[in-house]
Amino acid sequence: MMPFFIDENNILESFENAIKQFSPESCNYEEQRQKKIDDYKKGNIPYSHLIEIPDVIGGYYKGLFTSFEYKVPFAYLSFDIVSQINDNSRFVLELPSLLLLFEFSNKSGYNPKIKPIVSNVLYEYIKYKKTFLIYHVSFPFYEAIRSGYIYRYSEDVSEDIQLRMHALVAWIEANCQIVSNEEALAIEETRANDSELSRLFQHTISFLMRKDANYVLISDETYYSRITQSLPAISSEIFVKLFNEDSYKAFLNFMFECHICGASLTEQIIVDEYKKLEAGGENRFTEVIDSIKSNPISFQAVLSASISLASEKEDTGILTNAFTDLFESSFVILDHEFFKSQEWQNLIITLSFPIKGYDVVKKCVENAKRKLLS
């Protein structure tokens, strides 16, 4: 008989590992999951492919609110859609975006000034899962609650989940429009054998197919943002910036606290993580670099942070190395023609002014360019 051991400090994790251990596929489980995670990080599959049915809510909570590094669509991808938004636009929430805005509301009191749409199918699904989770243990949900990144409803995790799901339903009713799409319901009947996640997404995306209204999808699935480029879609970040700009920086901070990758970064986040790095303490400067690699709109925040830090330091050795890496990351996604542009020339001219710290920053950007082109 194969033994298993219970760690008194991590009882739930021990039981979860035991279940996997006794599974006939246990020898391949971790390898298969790691392959899926690698594919997800490369953008080859959506996060939903990492979720084990029927624990859909718990699966998204683990992705969004642990140290997993969930990847959101980079905000700059939405800019061309923003110009199409008008007073008649209606915004449709996908499940991960709904959970993200709900938990941000729990931490900050945020309420959307424009009520987004939640499909009636998604609303009823969440109400069903509220009951489902009373009788079924969700290890991913437990992990998210214990992470410390989201508001706690109760010290008892089981009670917390029940209270949280009740609050989620109430938040939807208070802050969203619950809309039924009859055309989508008709389509859904023909897709009864599809997975829960597939049917939820099909129903949500069907709003965008209608000709009678100006619908915009709010989606934080990076993969979907790539395959639906012809459809109007924005990220939660853009939605908050457009209609609750007073909450925008707090939302960016919240996403960074939750290890969500790809969102824009504030100058303060970059400064704080650099100071931790310089002090030799625990820091997330590598995550800052990873986010900036694919989010060039954070370049201004990097520039401002580097000038702020360089202007107050005498010994700039660590800073020069760190910000050379940051600038190189922010240049990666740009066309190399950028370095021949007037914008680049203006940057170098500005950093040549005899202002304290500018010479250090100029050295960083020129080193970054040299490394990138070598």
Segments predicted by a language model, with ranges:
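Active-site-proximal, substrate-binding regions of enzyme catalytic domains
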Residues: 1-57, 82-216, 222-373
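Charged, flexible boundary elements
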Residues: 60-81
